[in-house]
Amino acid sequence: MAVYVADPALDVRQHEYEMVWVIQPEASEERIEDLKSRISQVIQREGGHISTIDVWGKRTLAYPIKKYFEGYYLLYHFEMDPEGTDELERLIRFTEDIIRHLVIRLDE
């Protein structure tokens, strides 16, 4: 379901997204919190709103990814302008601690 902003000055169409990302298993709690903060800041800076953050914790991977057999999983539900996802993807791609991610648009 698309959400329309009521303020005409901010007349952008926002979409609902779900993002799962997997962090290297040996990442410290401080590093995980730092990554969560950076991702959240990008979403908010791009005009988005985070609905929920679910921490799934450390889980065994179905197959090795970058020589890792486990990963620390997080799930985000958020709304944001489609053009803002480019900046989010850029941040995730250039963060070495994130070994896998998937962003899915939920509406439609």
Predicted regions and their residues:
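Structured, basic alpha/beta domains of bacterial-type, RNA-associated proteins
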Residues: 2-108
